[in-house]
């Protein structure tokens, strides 16, 4: 899309729309209403635009509410000569605009999609200008990642996913029940059958081989030359957590006489070093198995590589293996792959599950990946490897109990790591023991158990307004705060035994909409529940902080209130899996307070003194507080909090 003011914007033609042609006309974005911005029909099926409202014009439309194909159809019916649909969620700087399946509507004009960022640029600087779309300037997208494709690492185990890829856009699929009908189709639901078909071909060619062997053949021979965006980021390869072993190549797979895999996980194939929170440098070792299906002894060269040269140059991660491995006919040999992490060279972690929870591309700045190439004169196979290291702190306390003398006492906090250990202090108001293993789900169980560990609360000020923060810690971590855990804080403002307000976390916009976790707060039973804050939660963490304005939950700083915290399985069952109930607290009169920890945290390779004081009237105002909860950022998964039980005063 070319305009006089804005640099050319890359747009992806949607193959179910009319064929692209050279068009030029005023760029229009109808802001009359939400309906005209989105281009969706109303409940009665009425086009949001009247008659031929946009003759000779190129119409810019927002994604959302209805199928993109319906937006393009409505634009064509309104006289537009082309439709451009801007995405409504952020994407990575190298991501292509999304591709969509056909969702109905009569297609009379070409439809295109652009990114949210490019849409914002056009809206700000190019409306009313003459825009030109010229197919002669088109760039082939073959061999590049579709923006909609899911990315890894896997949700539960932080292992490499996807395993492999296949074509998934611009598919013309047979339409069931029509005999001759065809329907444009796109998505992972289109690419998965392609991989299934290639596996079936291999099973037909090698009926005696196991599922693991078939998978190894496919993954070892996939094409790794997959990019992201030939226009914006030419030559930049897609990360392992988007392509896995690469794009399937059945001809290579059927002809290979060599396979390789993670010896500890033959069905996984790839070398997944996973998420690693590290307070010091570390080394990880995996064993690779290589099988020779040939009839002669073969000596293979082994070459570990990085996907990105900048990762290798950083020195944060190094990977090594023997130069060669010899394998006799029909046999399997092994070798070690050693991956070392220099924690002092790792980037400072700034990911989260709140405001950045949907920004998968940000993982690129922290994960390290590449391939182990194994080759001889006959075969060249590869294994993907990946690690997601998190430079962590290691704050510990000198005591978990403290008896105050004269209303005061101290606890020493130490941090032997190379990173400042940030500490959030809360009034400890509730704790719960760890559930027995027998109560936890096993592989294949369709339920989750969120096991509460401790609850804390504190008064804060946000933009000059009083607010409350509840800190919750759990046994076990979650890859992302969206699922499978919801935390419900029920507040009884007047001690009548009936909960009056609720605070809870949820995904912004609904299931799988944005990836961002937010906090809702409002009156029971029906709200309205206002969303004002992102959830303060990291990835691969059992910690969460929920924030709410006091005005949204019927409190003042001096209100003594009762509250309970419920843990809910919000993915499988919707059931409450744990609860800490009946806590009483007054925000401006805690029983104990702590001070002395720098805002930057406990210094790296240093210590800080936490001073704890009793508060006059706190025992009556906040009787449930029995100490302080120390909530740690950038912590090891098994040590994200400490509780200090306090007595005396």
Segment roles from a protein language model:
Residues 1-162, 166, 174-176, 240:
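Structured lumen-facing ectodomains of secretory-pathway proteins
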Residues 68-101, 165-232:
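Hydrolase catalytic cores
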Residues 293-314, 388-390, 488-493:
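Short acidic, flexible loop segments centered on an aromatic residue
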Residues 343-394:
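Terminal connector regions
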Residues 407-649:
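Surface-exposed extracytoplasmic segments
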């Amino acid at each position: 899309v070319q305009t006089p003011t804005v640099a050319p914007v890359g747009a992806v033609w949607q193959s179910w729309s009319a064929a692209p042609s050279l068009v030029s006309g005023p760029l229009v974005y109808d802001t009359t209403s939400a309906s005209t911005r989105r281009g969706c029909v109303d409940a009665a099926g009425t086009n949001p635009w009247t008659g031929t409202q946009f003759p000779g014009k190129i119409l810019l439309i927002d994604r959302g509410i209805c199928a993109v194909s319906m937006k393009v159809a409505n634009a064509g019916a309104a006289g537009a000569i082309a439709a451009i649909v801007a995405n409504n969620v952020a994407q990575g700087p190298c991501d292509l605009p999304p591709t969509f399946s056909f969702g109905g509507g009569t297609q009379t004009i070409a439809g295109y999609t652009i990114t949210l960022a490019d849409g914002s640029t056009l809206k700000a600087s190019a409306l009313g200008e003459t825009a030109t779309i010229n197919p002669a300037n088109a760039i082939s997208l073959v061999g590049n990642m579709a923006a909609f494709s899911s990315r890894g690492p896997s949700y539960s185990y932080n292992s490499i996913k996807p395993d492999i890829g296949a074509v998934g856009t611009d598919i013309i699929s047979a339409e069931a029940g029509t005999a001759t009908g065809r329907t444009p189709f796109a998505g992972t639901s289109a690419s998965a059958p392609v991989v299934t078909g290639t596996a079936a071909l291999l099973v037909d060619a090698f009926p005696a081989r196991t599922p693991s062997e078939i998978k190894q053949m496919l993954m070892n021979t996939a094409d790794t030359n997959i990019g992201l965006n030939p226009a914006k980021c030419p030559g930049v390869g897609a990360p392992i957590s988007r392509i896995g072993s690469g794009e399937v190549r059945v001809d290579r797979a059927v002809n290979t006489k060599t396979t390789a895999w993670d010896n500890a996980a033959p069905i996984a194939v790839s070398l997944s070093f996973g998420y690693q929170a590290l307070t010091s440098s570390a080394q990880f070792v995996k064993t690779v198995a290589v099988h020779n299906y040939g009839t002669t002894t073969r000596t293979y060269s082994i070459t570990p590589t990085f996907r990105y040269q900048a990762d290798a140059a950083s020195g944060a991660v190094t990977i090594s293996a023997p130069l060669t491995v010899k394998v006799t006919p029909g046999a399997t040999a092994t070798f070690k792959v050693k991956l070392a992490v220099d924690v002092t060279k790792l980037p400072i972690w700034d990911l989260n599950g709140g405001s950045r929870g949907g920004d998968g591309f940000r993982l690129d700045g922290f994960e390290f990946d590449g391939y182990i190439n194994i080759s001889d004169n006959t075969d060249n196979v590869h294994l993907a490897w990946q690690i997601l290291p998190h430079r962590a702190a290691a704050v510990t306390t000198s005591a978990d109990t403290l008896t105050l003398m004269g209303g005061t006492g101290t606890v020493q906090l130490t941090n032997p790591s190379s990173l400042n250990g940030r500490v959030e202090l809360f009034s400890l108001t509730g704790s719960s023991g760890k559930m027995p293993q027998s109560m936890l789900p096993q592989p294949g169980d369709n339920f989750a158990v969120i096991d509460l560990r401790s609850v804390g609360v504190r008064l804060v000020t946000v933009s000059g307004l009083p607010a409350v923060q509840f800190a919750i810690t759990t046994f076990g971590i979650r890859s992302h705060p969206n699922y499978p855990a919801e935390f419900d804080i029920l507040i009884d403002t007047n001690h009548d035994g009936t909960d009056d307000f609720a605070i809870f976390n949820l995904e912004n916009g609904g299931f799988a909409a944005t990836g961002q976790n937010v906090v809702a707060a409002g009156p029971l039973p029906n709200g309205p529940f206002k969303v004002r804050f992102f959830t303060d939660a990291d990835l691969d963490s059992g910690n969460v902080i929920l924030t709410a304005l006091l005005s949204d939950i019927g409190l003042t700083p001096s209100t003594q209130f009762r509250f309970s915290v419920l843990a809910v399985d919000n993915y499988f069952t919707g059931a409450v899996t744990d609860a800490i109930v009946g806590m009483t607290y007054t925000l401006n009169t805690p029983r104990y307070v702590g001070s002395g920890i720098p805002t930057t945290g406990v210094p790296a390779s240093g210590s800080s003194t936490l001073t704890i004081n009793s508060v006059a009237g706190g025992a009556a105002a906040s009787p449930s507080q029995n100490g302080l909860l120390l909530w740690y950022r950038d912590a090891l998964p098994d040590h994200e909090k400490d509780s200090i039980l306090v007595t005396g005063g």
